[in-house]
């Protein structure tokens, strides 16, 4: 379970010569083990900043973050029990698919026989086991994201953060990747927080949905209820109803 308790951060952006623009963010959220939560909202609302605070890339000004009962607010990003997948796959171009996945286990690729076998299994689960000897430049965009997903999964962390990793893929492939994440998350009982600008994608994969507006979670609940029967006026306007 992940719990955000008044996780706050004030972001100041230098605007024109007359003033600076600021956004005061404050997040409260409880996600149970195995929840897949879609984070929706307008650009600049604070969705990516929320994931950055959870991942440790952005230091909160105050508040607490617990994962499975452990306080991780001050932990270094590398020590946090989570994985994160971005729109950019971040594969190393000079390493093979096998090696890129292996980085999820050991940054120096010092792997045991069992760990090497685990890499093959992870590659098979996401459908790239035929390409283990290839370099990223020899893969399609969808295949690269599958490799990046395998690298996340092999770490076997209880929390997976997705920052629109499939938004650049064509609709059919994006749907396939979302179903893959949903299947694996259920199988491993992984908690997933996923940023998306597509209500349809949220409905396909998530059981809960958080609408973020002006740095706060304005609406939170079951996805079908939040998106199918919206009652909040700001959310209704965002959805275009």
UniProtKB/Swiss-Prot annotation:
The keyword Endoplasmic reticulum does not apply. GO terms for molecular function: ABC-type thiamine transporter activity; ATP binding; ATP hydrolysis activity. Residues 2-239 form the ABC transporter domain. Its EC number is 7.6.2.15. ATP binds at residues 41-48. InterPro entries: AAA+_ATPase (IPR003593), ABC_SmlMolc_Importer (IPR050093), ABC_transporter-like_ATP-bd (IPR003439), ABC_transporter-like_CS (IPR017871), P-loop_NTPase (IPR027417), Thiamine_ABC_ThiQ (IPR005968). It is found in: Cell inner membrane. It is a peripheral membrane protein. It catalyses: thiamine(out) + ATP + H2O = thiamine(in) + ADP + phosphate + H(+). Disulfide bonds: none annotated. Keywords: ATP-binding, Cell inner membrane, Cell membrane, Membrane, Nucleotide-binding, Translocase, Transport. Part of the ABC transporter complex ThiBPQ involved in thiamine import. Responsible for energy coupling to the transport system. Belongs to the ABC transporter superfamily. Thiamine importer (TC 3.A.1.19.1) family. This is Thiamine import ATP-binding protein ThiQ. It comes from Photobacterium profundum (strain SS9). The lineage of its organism: Bacteria, Pseudomonadati, Pseudomonadota, Gammaproteobacteria, Vibrionales. The gene is thiQ.
């Amino acid at each position: 379970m992940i719990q955000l308790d008044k996780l706050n951060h004030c972001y100041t952006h230098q605007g024109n010569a007359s003033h600076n623009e600021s956004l005061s963010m404050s997040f409260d959220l409880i996600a149970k083990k195995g929840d897949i939560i879609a984070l929706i909202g307008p650009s600049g609302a604070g969705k990516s900043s929320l994931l950055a605070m959870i991942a440790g890339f952005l230091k909160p000004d105050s508040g607490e973050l617990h994962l499975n009962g452990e306080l991780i607010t001050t932990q270094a990003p590398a020590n946090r029990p989570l994985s994160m997948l971005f729109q950019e796959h971040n594969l190393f171009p000079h390493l093979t698919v096998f090696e890129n996945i292996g980085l999820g286990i050991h940054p120096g690729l010092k792997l045991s026989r069992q760990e090497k076998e685990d890499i093959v299994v992870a590659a098979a689960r996401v459908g790239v086991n035929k390409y283990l000897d290839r370099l990223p430049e020899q893969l399609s965009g969808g295949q690269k994201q599958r490799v990046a997903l395998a690298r996340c999964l092999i770490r076997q962390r209880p929390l997976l953060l997705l920052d629109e990793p499939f938004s650049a893929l064509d609709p059919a492939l994006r749907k396939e990747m979302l179903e893959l994440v949903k299947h694996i998350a259920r199988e491993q009982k992984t908690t997933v927080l996923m940023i998306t600008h597509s209500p349809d994608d949220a409905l396909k994969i998530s059981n809960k949905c958080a609408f973020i507006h002006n740095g706060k979670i304005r609406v939170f609940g079951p996805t079908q209820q939040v998106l199918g029967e919206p009652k909040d006026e700001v959310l209704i306007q965002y959805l275009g109803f």
